[in-house]
């Protein structure tokens, strides 16, 4: 037989292989000796050395046995994998009154065009899955960029990786996230699902929300059942209802899409798009925000009723942002006596409005950003828990040259959970929930001490790529005061976090964080310290992620990619004036991700 490569793109070839196995099954149950013999290739050998020439006589002796005709070869779970001119079919289940098992049949197409068996062995499917899983895990565990306590995509590349559908339900935090695969025969977006009792150790659930799942949220319907309002790719905005308390099973409503149907002459015809929705129940009415450059509000008396547009989301514009700045990934909630609208725009990244929701419109009073330089902090999602805490996550994007598919084999990182509150100045306050303290170990304390002008002080005993720092310092005459992390001994690699007193900005400078082909941006967020006030930095380092919280009033998240194994140092520095460090506390943080 001449060697050839099979065109595996043709489904007919796979069907021909399976048809040969079905014919063998039928011949076995019928006691058809010639049909059974013909199934095997001339080169076939059994594990005991039986050849095709010996097989006919063997079968004649067995055919009158009481159970042979009751054997069944079941192909329900079998997959066909092609390797050159060999087709491996695995697992093939053998069912027999005297036992059974799972097998791999290796088939080849012979010169007459028929597919015949060249070998039979125990199924290797479980072994191959285990080997592949182990290989992936070992690769990921050795990846110096993969965060250990920020939630990351458990396997593969997720782009986008928006958090979605967050809800506190039956004592657990549930979080969904967008990912992509080809399980349905084509590349499609699904919602992965995890839950946790402590916000850091996550249990993975089966994927119950499949195909075309884009951004959306989760809320309780009139019956108190978790309900998601989401964008169904190719269909429009849609609804699904949970069928169990673990939120594993969902029913997509037959009434979807909920996108209102308008006609020429209707008041709202042609105004709005079906885009990133956010749904909720208010009294007896269901509402949904439809995102876009002209975001809309839709409503219905019933989830599966007729939805109609109520009109524009915004009652008016607000200083600092154009009225037509697109609203995507919206999240509307009450906080501190006001209403907050978290969202992104594709130009400004993560941002929020503070104002009032009344008369079926949002009346914004102020607007602020949560990403300033390159929109790498993206797609916010929040929930409220049993303690009344409003907790949000966001997607922290990889830099474009990360090499997710070719080098690292994964992509998808969420921010730390942030507990939100509203200050008297109308700006959000943000901090990490107290549950993270359970991950701390190896505490080191420093201070008080003075850092001379234009000097930096290494923090002996404080080093690592998985850290939490609490630094309290002041420098009345200094232009810059702050801390450097992931610093190499010679200073060639370092990430600088500091308060710029002249510009009144909190800055994270990544211009020396890694090689030239990694991000070099300086993220700068509005932040002002009044005279006599101390700078209080809370810094989280997690391999390629740095998150900074300043006085509970401002926060920055950045990706960094140090290349040197000795880039683990911590230094405190001051520029153009002395600084006094009142205290520095440091902890190592144990990973909460399994790998």
Feature locations, PLM:
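Conserved Ser/Thr-centered positions that define the repeating blades of beta-propeller domains
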Residues: 196, 240-244, 297-302, 355, ...
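Short beta-strand edge/turn micro-motifs at domain boundaries
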Residues: 1-6, 10, 88-90, 100-127
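Beta-rich accessory regions
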Residues: 357-375, 381-595
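Surface loop/turn signatures of beta-propeller and other carbohydrate-active proteins
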Residues: 128-165, 183-186, 200-220, 247-281, ...
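Surface-exposed, charged secondary-structure patches
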Residues: 16-18, 56-104
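A short gly/proline-enriched turn/hairpin at secondary-structure junctions
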Residues: 39-53, 66-69
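Hydrophobic core segments of beta-strands in well-ordered, beta-rich domains
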Residues: 161-182, 205-207, 215-241, 258, ...
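Short, low-complexity N-terminal intrinsically disordered segments enriched in polar/charged residues
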Residues: 1-42, 53-57, 74, 85
């Amino acid at each position: 037989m001449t060697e050839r490569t099979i065109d595996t793109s043709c489904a007919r070839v796979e069907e021909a292989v399976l048809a040969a196995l079905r014919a063998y099954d039928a011949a076995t149950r019928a006691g058809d000796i010639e049909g059974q013999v013909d199934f095997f290739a001339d080169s076939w050998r059994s594990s005991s050395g039986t050849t095709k020439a010996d097989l006919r006589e063997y079968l004649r002796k067995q055919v009158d046995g009481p159970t042979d005709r009751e054997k069944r070869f079941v192909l329900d779970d079998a997959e066909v994998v092609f390797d050159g001119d060999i087709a491996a079919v695995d697992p093939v289940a053998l069912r027999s009154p005297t036992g059974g098992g799972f097998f791999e049949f290796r088939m080849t197409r012979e010169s007459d065009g028929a597919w015949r068996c060249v070998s039979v062995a125990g199924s290797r499917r479980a072994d191959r899955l285990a080997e592949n899983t182990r290989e992936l895990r070992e690769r990921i565990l050795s990846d110096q960029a993969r965060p250990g306590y920020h939630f990351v995509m458990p396997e593969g590349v997720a782009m986008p990786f928006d958090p979605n559908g967050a809800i506190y339900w039956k004592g657990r935090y549930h979080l969904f996230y967008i990912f992509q695969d080809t399980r349905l025969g084509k590349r499609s977006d699904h919602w992965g699902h995890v839950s946790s009792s402590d916000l850091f150790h996550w249990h993975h659930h089966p994927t119950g929300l499949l195909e075309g799942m884009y951004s959306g949220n989760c809320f309780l319907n009139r019956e108190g059942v978790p309900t998601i309002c989401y964008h169904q790719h190719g269909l429009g905005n849609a609804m699904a209802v949970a069928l169990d308390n673990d939120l594993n099973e969902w029913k997509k409503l037959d009434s979807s899409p909920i996108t209102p149907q308008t006609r020429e002459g209707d008041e709202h015809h042609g105004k709005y798009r079906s885009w990133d929705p956010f749904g909720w129940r208010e009294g007896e009415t269901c509402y949904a925000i439809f995102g876009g450059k002209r975001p809309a509000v839709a409503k219905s008396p019933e989830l599966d009723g007729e939805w109609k547009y109520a009109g524009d989301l915004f009652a008016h514009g607000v200083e600092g942002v154009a009225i037509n700045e697109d609203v995507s990934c919206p999240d509307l909630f009450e906080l501190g006596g006001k209403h907050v609208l978290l969202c992104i725009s594709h130009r400004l990244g993560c941002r929020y409005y503070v104002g009032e929701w009344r008369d079926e419109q949002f009346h914004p009073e102020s607007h602020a950003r949560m990403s300033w330089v390159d929109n790498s902090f993206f797609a916010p999602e929040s929930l409220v828990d049993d303690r009344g805490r409003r907790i949000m996550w966001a997607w922290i994007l990889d830099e474009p040259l990360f090499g997710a598919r070719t080098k690292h084999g994964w992509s998808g990182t969420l921010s730390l959970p942030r507990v939100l509150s509203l200050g008297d100045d109308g700006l959000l306050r943000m901090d990490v929930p107290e549950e993270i303290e359970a991950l701390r170990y190896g505490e080191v304390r420093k201070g008080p001490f003075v850092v001379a002008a234009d000097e930096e002080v290494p923090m002996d005993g404080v080093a690592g790529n998985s850290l939490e720092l609490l630094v309290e310092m002041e420098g009345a005459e200094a232009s810059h005061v702050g801390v450097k992390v992931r610093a190499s001994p010679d200073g060639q690699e370092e990430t600088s976090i500091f308060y710029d007193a002249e510009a009144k900005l909190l800055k994270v400078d990544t211009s020396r964080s890694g090689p030239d082909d990694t991000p070099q941006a300086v993220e700068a967020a509005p932040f002002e310290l009044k005279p006599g006030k101390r700078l209080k930095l809370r810094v989280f380092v997690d391999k390629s992620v740095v998150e900074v919280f300043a006085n509970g009033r401002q926060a920055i998240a950045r990706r960094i990619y140090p290349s040197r194994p000795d880039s683990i140092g911590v230094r405190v520095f001051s520029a153009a004036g002395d600084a006094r460090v009142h205290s520095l506390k440091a902890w190592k943080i144990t990973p909460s991700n399994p790998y």
